[in-house]
Amino acid sequence: MSGVETVGVHADAHRDSWQVRAQKQITYEVRFRDDVFGLDSTDLLEAGADGAGSRRRFVVVDSAVDALYGSRIREYFTHHGIDHSILVMRVGETVKDFDTAGRIVAAMDAFGLARRREPMIVVGGGVLMDVAGLVASLYRRGTPFLRVPTTLVGLIDAGVGAKTGVNFNGHKNRLGTYAPADLTLLDRRFLATLDRRHLSNGLAEMLKIALIKDAELFQLLERHGRVLIEERFQGRTGTGDRAAVRALRAATHGMLEELGPNLWESRLERSVDYGHTFSPTIEMRALPALLHGEAVCVDMALTTVLAYRRGLLDVAQRDRIFAVMTALGLPTWHPLLTPEVLEAALQDTVRHRDGWQRLPLPVGIGGVTFVNDVTAAELQAAALMQHRLAEDALLLRA
């Protein structure tokens, strides 16, 4: 994370007070890079360090990633003559907390991390991105870090934005900061070892972007979604390769296009909050049964029905959306969609969005609007219809 600080100080002699105004420009990069840990790649060694940099690196690696790629990661740093310390961590939503963050801090202290010259490197999925990003933003009040996401959620969602966080008091990401990594390297080769469920999990976030702003991406998922899963975005066929490249770039560009002008969320009408109104509560109450993207898809299915009932979608569009969700291996219903849970979820979201629902609903496929007048009765009716449509979609797929 780089930038220039500008400061102005104004003294008011009549009030015996001073007003300080400061601005800091933030610049960060998201870059596609095949074979990040190939011995000829130096991206990770050139980014994020002030001045002359250092030949030392502290690296946090997800334990599942370490089991598959650990020897290659160690070989990479050894080959380049980097004095490195690797902290291997088991992470997940159930341990996305301050205890996990504290373990990273303790390891950084033990390594003796230099504040500016030795950016922390984070290699793993979205949960690790969030926790380690929070640590980087807090450690000595701000330490640069680099991200190498290894899951689809990480590549197109958690790894490209500025938000960090941990769960607290039963709430998802209740404590967090805005702290983008100086550089995020997106390497689709990591998806080759991702299981089908976690691929589907990430496809939910890709579908979110498609539904709120990219009809062409929706059509791509409609036509080639199953191929993307079968080939794990590795492009084993010409069709699969073209689809994988287009889908990953469209989703990443779409996400950054939405985040960039509103990085600090000064505007709370955020189209990328689609699928994230009810899902935080559902996901936390369902732990560990639902993955993040699965909860998001359940939310999107509900809000698709809300949009249909309000005339924002026609029946054909509604059914196409449900069909794609099902084809991608995503749930469109969950027993937690009760009136009590939906009301609690909406109330918490209203507090998060400063007193208004600011609920994004799809308009057709590829458009979005925001509403503030959804009622409990409307939610209950939509959930009942959603349950029926979910069962119908499963029957059609069978």
Curated annotation (Swiss-Prot):
SUPFAM superfamilies for the chain = Dehydroquinate synthase-like
Is NAD there in the keyword field? yes
What sort of enzyme, by top EC class, is this? lyase
Among Gene3D superfamilies, the record links this protein to: 3.40.50.1970, Dehydroquinate synthase-like - alpha domain (1.20.1090.10)
For this chain's record, the cofactor binding note is: Divalent metal cation such as Co(2+).
What keywords would UniProt list here?
A: Cobalt, Lyase, Metal-binding, NAD, Nucleotide-binding
Query: Which residues hold a divalent metal cation?
Result: E205, H276, H292
InterPro entries recorded: Dehydroquinate_synthase, DHQS/DOIS_N, DHQS_C, EEVS-like
Cofactor(s) the protein needs: NAD(+); Co(2+)
Family of this protein: Belongs to the sugar phosphate cyclases superfamily. EEVS family.
The record ties this protein, via PANTHER family, to: 2-EPI-5-EPI-VALIOLONE SYNTHASE, 3-DEHYDROQUINATE SYNTHASE
Official protein name in the record: 2-epi-5-epi-valiolone synthase
Source organism per entry reads: Actinoplanes sp. (strain ATCC 31044 / CBS 674.73 / SE50/110)
What's the gene? acbC
